[in-house]
């Protein structure tokens, strides 16, 4: 079984957008998840650079791409 894409939002509920306070709560929850992913990515990046591990650096780039996708999804959710 393939691991879920961390760049896909888990908490942005389209049906909650009818109630702004709930929608903002969903966005806040997703933003907190994004912060956790960023913390992990920064730890992984520091470790990869210390070891000069090209494969680990490539994995950090994938983590960064996932964060970019998640950031864009949160912005779309708030703006629409």
Segments from the language model and where they lie:
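Cytosolic, long alpha-helical scaffolding segments
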Residues: 1-80
């Amino acid at each position: 079984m393939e691991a879920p894409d961390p760049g896909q939002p888990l908490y942005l509920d389209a049906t909650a957008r009818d109630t702004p306070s709930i929608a903002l709560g969903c966005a806040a929850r997703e933003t907190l998840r994004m912060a956790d992913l960023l913390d992990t990515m920064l730890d992984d990046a520091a470790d990869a650079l210390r070891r000069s591990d090209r494969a680990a650096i490539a994995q950090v780039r994938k983590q960064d791409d996932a964060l970019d996708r998640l950031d864009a999804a949160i912005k779309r959710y708030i703006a629409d």
